[in-house]
Amino acid sequence: MTTAFTVVIPSRYASTRLPGKPLLDIAGKPMIQHVWEQASKSSASRVVVATDDARIVEACKAFGAEVVLTREDHNSGTDRLAEVAAKLGLEPDAIVVNVQGDEPLIPPSVIDQVAANLAAHTEARMATLAEPIEDVETLFNPNVVKVVSDLNGLALTFSRATLPLARDAFAKRRDVLPEGVPYRRHIGIYAYRAGFLQDFVSWGPCWLENTESLEQLRALWHGVRIHVADALIAPPTGVDTAEDLERVRRLLEA
């Protein structure tokens, strides 16, 4: 069983809400540098930025990061990850952790946790994290992905819908969470086995993945086991909007 792992940080220049997001300044550094620095504090043996944009390549080289230039036609971050794993020549059982390029506050311990979980669960080809849902607003928010696991910690399904739907309890009232139902929010950090990444992209999207816009459903569709654990530390939300950017700037410039 290998416990060593590589972090890959997919980073795209294009963004509908925040064009050039990876290079936006936060406390004197581009956002991608903050993400790379946090990932470098983890136990990863290697941290690599993956991008299709020459401007991001140059910025990463300037602060000393290893960077791989990828194709521009990838449909998803996982497709980009698979290309990088192949270019790096990673062994099929090597562990790769995907850290999003817009999470400058990600705790290094979270990266270590998801990698260690996959290493410890040889029956799984993916691992990810979750945290408890504590209010009905979050539960009914379609932008929050819910996850249900079996008694062994393996994912049964993910959905943007209310999952599971407590039929009887919600028939009476929807302003409080039903007792005894462990609602959980999926946290979008993944560890993969490198060989699995090549299988994943070869399958192509399935209708369920397309319906929910959730890539991990492609893995479940093909019978892949995904280990899910509660995060030891809940990571702060990433930077998706101008408001998020200002919030992170205030935290890092304080």
Curated annotation (Swiss-Prot):
A Gene Ontology molecular function term of the record: 3-deoxy-manno-octulosonate cytidylyltransferase activity
Signal peptide range in chain numbering: none
Protein localization: Cytoplasm
EC class: transferase
Keyword annotations from UniProtKB, A to Z: Cytoplasm, Lipopolysaccharide biosynthesis, Nucleotidyltransferase, Transferase
Family: Belongs to the KdsB family.
The protein's name: 3-deoxy-manno-octulosonate cytidylyltransferase
Organism: Pseudomonas fluorescens (strain Pf0-1)
Native organism taxonomy: Bacteria, Pseudomonadati, Pseudomonadota, Gammaproteobacteria, Pseudomonadales
